[in-house]
Structures are given as structure tokens and as C-alpha cells.
Amino acid sequence: QQRVAREHAIVEHIFSHAIVNEDEILTYFDHHLAPAETFNGDVFICKPSPSGGLYFLVGDFTGHGLASAIGALPVTRAFQEMTAKGLAVSELALELNNVLLRFLPADMFMAAVIGEIGADGKRLTLWQGGMPEMLLVSENGDVRRLNAKHMALGILESQEFNSDSDTLTMRHGDQLVCYTDGLMEVTNDKKEMLG
């Protein structure tokens, strides 16, 4: 019992130091991670781009618990290295797919949204694979639904993988809403799913 608790504490320490978002960058995002267990497969990473914009990744690994969370370590490291180089979103998607193919067992993958907001705050470049639809909500409440067009990361080999990204124009006051399937699986007091 004590050994398991100690091992969990060690792993939690490693995760808390490996997946760190800069406070200055986090001010541009409202985010909430509420794992059902101590460890889970949901990940949110945001980094500045060399051109003055912002990169972000919202990911959801298959499974639950520590086994699903472990994939976040190579993804975080690769994301940090590639965003520091200013790679395009499509290149990020391709490289993260390759990282996951190398590191994960064949039955694991990561649904993900990878995005870059341009320095002007207007250009939004997105790659979506295996995630629930995103919502682009205008200042006056109009909602544009953005559906994933690709398979999740870590499934297809490079020659089959589609890294095409979409570029959208955002207006002042627009909000981008992204969530994992965990939100749709939340239940009310009657055990009815809300999603």
C-alpha cells in the first residue's frame, strides 16, 4: 500500500514538472482539467510561437489512469521542441503522429486538436483528429461548428497520414471552445449522460 502511494507520488511529481504551461501564455486560455482519477489521458499544452502567436494542443489518450497518461510525456517534449522552431501546424501533426507511433503500443492513440493563433489574433490554423467538434462562438453568440477531419494521432503510418490543416479568420471577441469526449460522458444525479 505504501509502495503504491510512493510510486504514485513520484509519477505525479514527474508529470507536474514535465507538463508546464507558462503563466503568461495561460492568460489567453480558460481551461479546466478535471480527471476522474489521479492520472488520466487528457492533456493541454500551450506555448508561444517564435513569430509572436500562440500554439496549443488539446489531447485525449485512449484508456484511463496512468497507462493513458504516460503518453503525455513524449508528446509534451516533442510539442515544446517543435513549437520553439516555429513549425507549421501540419508539420506538428505529422511529427506528433510519428512520435506516438514510435512510443505507444498499437492499441493506444491520442485524439487531438493542434492549433496556432497568429500574432494578430485573427488567423487560426487548426488540425483536428478524432476529437469532438469544436465551437467557434462569435461575440454576439453565433456558433460555428468545426468538425474533426482526420484520424487520431498514433494510428496511421506517415504515408497514410493526412496532416492538412485549416485556416480560419477570427474576429475580436470570438471564443474557441474545445473539449474531450470526457465532457460528453459526464452524468447528472440520475446517471444520465449530459453530452
Protein language model annotation of sequence segments:
Residues 2-177:
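… and, occasionally, acidic/histidine-rich disordered N-termini of signaling adaptors
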Residues 185-186:
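Short acidic/polar inter-strand loop motif in beta-rich domains
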Residues 190-195:
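Short, intrinsically disordered, charge-balanced linker/junction segments flanking boundaries
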